[in-house]
Each structure stands twice: as C-alpha cells, then as structure tokens.
From Swiss-Prot:
UniProt xrefs under Pfam families: YfbU (PF03887)
Signal peptide: none
Matching Gene3D superfamilies: Helix hairpin bin (1.10.287.680), yfbu gene product, domain 2 (1.10.3190.10)
Annotated HAMAP family: UPF0304
Lineage, uppermost ranks: Bacteria, Pseudomonadati, Pseudomonadota, Gammaproteobacteria, Vibrionales
Coiled-coil features, chain-numbered ranges: none
Protein family: Belongs to the UPF0304 family.
Annotated protein name in UniProt: UPF0304 protein VFMJ11_1926
Length: 166
C-alpha cells in the first residue's frame, strides 16, 4: 500500500483515536499506528490484507455457482421419494470456498447470504461457507455440466449425479 506522508499521518491519527475509543483493542491499534508512522512496508501489507477486489465477472460466476446449487436443491425436492433415494442429499449443500486460498470468494458468499439476504435456504454450518478445501475448479466443472442439462431447474437423479461427479 503506497501512502503519502499526509495519508500516513491521517491513518496514524485514526488508529490513535480507535485506541482511545476501543480500549479492548487498544494494543492492536497502537501497533498499527506504530507500523504506519514508521513506514514498515512488510507490516503495512497486513493492514490491507482484507482489502480485496472481485471483478464483476467473478461475482457473477459465484452467483452462478450458488444458483446452480439452488436449482439442484429445488430439483431434488420435486423428485419422487424413489428418485430422491438415489441422490446423496448431503451433496446438495453448498459448502462455499476455502478461506485459506479462496478468501475473497468466501467473503463474497458471506456478503450475499448475510448482508444481502440471498439464498437463505443455504446452511452456513459451523464453518460459515469455509469448505476448508479449494472448490473453485470443482464448481466450474459442475457449472459446465449443469448448463448442458436441458431443464436446469427440473433435474432428474441421473443429472444430479452427473453434476456432482463433474
């Protein structure tokens, strides 16, 4: 993060004010103030680690993944009990993304479900959409298979299995 001296002074003052307003986190803010004042470039990087940027294309792709899961869940609910028995219902749960390698995607899913109120039927589970394993490539393969299905919102058990196994 490149900052002018004036920007560093403003940020330093903000950290000082935060340390006064939030005594429980005062040490954290004082440390951040010191990093900014002294210009420690390595540590300054940790100050902006949560600043991300997801392009419009990436946002739409994530929404497509979530919509695919919504369609699979709705399709499952429309199946007969006999056909439902052929589907592993656990695989209908949208797991999210890996926080270690796909943090921006996890945060976007959390934003969509919490702040925007979308997909309330998705179970956040204990991990709140942290799948704990990379999922982006898997979802892309699944999405390709789903898009090739003639009736995307009325899938049969065979089509669900094909999507799961993509």
């Amino acid at each position: 993060m490149d900052m002018t001296n004036a920007q560093r002074l403003i940020l330093s003052n903000q950290y000082y004010l935060m340390s006064q307003m939030d005594p429980a986190n005062a040490e954290k803010y004082k440390r951040q103030q010191l990093i900014v004042e002294r210009g420690y470039e390595l540590q300054i990087r940790e100050l902006d680690k949560d600043f991300g940027c997801i392009t419009e294309t990436e946002c739409r792709e994530i929404i497509d993944f979530m919509e695919m899961y919504h369609a699979m869940q709705e399709s499952y609910n429309m199946l007969s009990e006999e056909c439902q028995a052929k589907v592993d219902a656990r695989r209908l749960q949208f797991l999210g993304f890996d926080i270690a390698t796909e943090a921006q995607q996890v945060n976007y899913v959390r934003f969509l479900t919490s702040s925007e109120g979308l997909y309330p039927q998705f179970d956040k589970a204990d991990h709140h959409f942290n799948s704990q394993m990379p999922m982006l490539d898997k979802y892309r393969r699944m999405l390709t298979t789903w898009r090739n299905c003639p009736r995307q919102y009325h899938l049969c058990s065979t089509e669900l299995a094909q999507i799961f196994n993509a």
